A protein has these predicted regions:
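Charge-dense, helix-prone N-terminal extensions
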Residues: 1-138
Length: 138
């Protein structure tokens, strides 16, 4: 797996592991579990550290992993373009681009459906549809 986003001599993967350890509660466990599912869904995923949060990429950003007091939020950057038959997306539903999964303490996310969503995001990024179109100059 490639690593990107090194900071202060630490790789992005090390910074993500550090964040998980610092959380030390259900949020750290949840973020760790979701990280494992992302890696299982895409062995070529690139871990990055941006905006003080974990970011997983493959030909573009797949999702970020944010931790707040009451939730762990996985924001899919092109989520509005993805099919979500399992209805995992439960946040940021009104926008034209992003979709998010908010996970509260005690909640479980369907692992198979989540991995399918990650694979779909990778396929979308790799298709070139995720790249902004270039406007013609007049």
């Amino acid at each position: 797996m490639k690593k990107s986003g090194a900071s202060q001599g630490q790789s992005a993967s090390e910074l993500i592991s550090k964040r998980i350890a610092e959380l030390g509660d259900w949020r750290g466990e949840t973020l760790s579990r979701m990280r494992k599912l992302i890696k299982a869904a895409d062995p070529n995923v690139v871990e990055e550290w941006k905006w003080m949060n974990p970011v997983w990429s493959h030909d573009g950003i797949i999702c970020t992993g944010e931790s707040y007091k009451n939730i762990v939020k996985l924001t899919f950057f092109k989520g509005a373009s993805l099919k979500d038959p399992a209805r995992l997306f439960n946040s940021s539903l009104d926008g034209n681009v992003r979709r998010a999964i908010d996970i509260h303490e005690g909640e479980e996310v369907d692992a198979s459906a989540f991995k399918a969503l990650v694979r779909q995001a990778v396929a979308f990024n790799s298709s070139g549809k995720a790249k902004p179109s270039k406007k013609a100059k007049s």
